[in-house]
């Protein structure tokens, strides 16, 4: 796994999936065979296959939460914001702390139980849609399709 820390000015980007997207990471270590986000590789400078790299976005600027007022925000539209590196970097938690008092419609998608760490913050978000992937209970099939999610 190739890991790079990259400096960014902002975590927000305009999107057709919502009005804004927040992706604190580029790439994803989950290596799911069915992943729709693998098209993102062409926008990176990586020669590695999708699932073999992750860029950790480091942003010192606070999110301009005024932009998000009454907007639809999709967090982790092309990565998993609770990927294993989130345990170290805590970027998702930092972002959620900024969104707690913002009246926006937040959609968050993950397949990692690390999401449980942030339940204290997620409970405070007024309009939250939390999607958690549970792909299969067949461990052999899971190992073939999805190297990351657990059935425990």
Give names to the regions the model predicted.
Residues 58-152:
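Conserved AdoMet/S-adenosylmethionine-binding subsite of the radical SAM
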Residues 1-31, 36-74:
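N-terminal [4Fe-4S]-dependent radical SAM core
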